[in-house]
Amino acid sequence: MNRFNILGLGTALPPHAISQNGYATFAATVVAPEACDSNNMPGLVQVLYRRAGVQTRHSVLLASSSEDEATAERFFRRAKNIDDRGPGTAERMNRYELEAGRLAATAASKALADAAIDPEHVTHLVTVSCSGFSAPGVDLYH
């Protein structure tokens, strides 16, 4: 049986970020008011985001960084009506596929540097994303 070792780790984040509080404020504005059973939707969203344990959100969807404003976020727009659910799964996965390769390449370069080995010595690549997936995956990015 072959043994394996994790020789290097590399991570990458999108360049722009927003505070959790700032994104909670933005999230509360994109929900159609009539889609909620409560008049206190902004307050409920704030509680949900505060309890998530996240401090900062990095996103490829932000055109610039700001502590508390997501004004450059255009992918998720304010709901037009109660049936408007925003971008569908296909649209979100297309955006993921467009953005993920660059981040994966950055993380892979860092992992190779951390391992101090040449790429031709790598036999397996493990990737993790909390945002989406594509098939074939980011391992074919070039």
Regions found by a protein language model. Give the residues of each.
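Short glycine-rich or small-residue beta-strand-to-loop segments that form or flank ligand, phosphate
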Residues: 95, 123-129
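Gly/Ser/Thr-rich loops at beta-strand to alpha-helix junctions
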Residues: 12-14, 129-135
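Conserved "HGTGT" condensation-loop signature of ketosynthase/thiolase-family condensing enzymes
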Residues: 1-120
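A glycine- and small-aliphatic-rich helix-loop capping segment at beta-alpha/alpha-beta transitions
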Residues: 134-142
